[in-house]
Amino acid sequence: MTTGAPTTDPLTTPEPETGMTTDLSTDHSRAQADAAHSHGRGGVPEASRAARLASFDLADFPVPTGREEEWRFAPVDRLAPVLDAAGEGLTGSGTLVTVVNPPEVTVEIVGRDDARLGTAGRPGDRAAAAAWASFRESTVVTIGREAVASEPVSIRVEGVPGNGDPSAVHLLVHARELSEAIVVIDHVGPAVLGETIEVVAEDGAHLTVVSIQDWDGGALHAASHRVRLGRDAHVRHVVVTLGGEVVRITPDVEFTGEGAEFEGVGLYFADAGQHLEHRLFVDHAVPSCRSRVAYKGALQGAGAHAVWVGDVLIRAIAEGTDTYELNRNLVLTDGARADSVPNLEIETGVIEGAGHASATGRFDDEQLFYLRARGIPEEDARRLVVRGFFAELIQQIGVPAVEERLIAAIEVELERTMSALATVTPAAEVPAEVAP
């Protein structure tokens, strides 16, 4: 894809047909394919991702210790409030949910006994089960059969200042047959939140769901996104994570009808002390479906930590599957770390294609030297590299207002980078002449 951005991505583009995992980092990243997983019951490894425990019952999930596969990168002590480690439930009232919807879309507030809730799948870990067990009411957004939303649906999940008790929020986005809509979910303010977002796309529906995590510093957020696609449905699922102290997003995607397509797009920027974690599971459970997942992140500052885990399962029945997942991380300063783990499990040889790639690299000093040698100031050169790194994915979001906001947020992050470098790093020397 041609984006018009400068060719300044410091990481080599992996070849999709190889499915190899590339690690370009030194001590800041680990990229590996794991053949076993742990669902928390005594740390017993599973032979298949399909064997992972999924249950609506919180008692089925012990409080994690950090030794479990599912939690090995997470700061479980800091996440304790949203894991309901005390067994008291996430009963606070620290968040408000507001919705602005076009006339083609209906919004309801329903009790937890509504039959539509839980249809997108079951919780897959302790945080998801705690959020499910604790919510009292759900906000249900429905796009009617064959309806086309005239403008994006805006959902705002806002933390209430001064209310630090852990709370739970439940949202359901339901796209009926042959409908089309864009839904933007914005998370802002202070919060200690366990969240469930269910996305149901019925046959032939086309749905874009954008979840933006732009919390205040100190926020704790664990969110389970459960996505179910019917026959010929298309879902573009976008995750943008910028704010919060600890944010952990776990999208689970299930295909239930042939011909469906899922696009997963993720962008994140971790600053000093932040832990931003994204764990995906794409379950190809029926034939002839397609999935594409691409996440990119940048990190800067001491203690900045980004985690990406992408699990793809192609079941024996899912012949004709076409899947590919990619994760890239750009480490801008010392003291930051990115962990990237792509996993691909294939139970049938009759597929269209399957592959994954992971790359993590430091800021390329040679490339910076090259740009500066051609008269580009260091600050501008660094901006060009980072803008080029994110440009293609930003254009894939498909929501201009979100794209503009993200570009502005990246500029703010780059200002922080420049300020930090100005205080600790002397300017690099540039030769007076460079041979053509």
Across the structure, where does each feature detected by a protein language model lie?
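Generic hydrophobic-segment detector
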Residues: 49, 60-62, 324, 365, ...
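Conserved beta-strand/loop scaffold segments within soluble protein domains that form the structured core
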Residues: 9, 24, 118-376, 386, ...
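N-terminal amphipathic, basic helical "cap/leader" segment at the start of enzyme domains
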Residues: 2-132, 137, 148, 295, ...
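Residue-level "edge-of-site" marker
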Residues: 71, 384-385
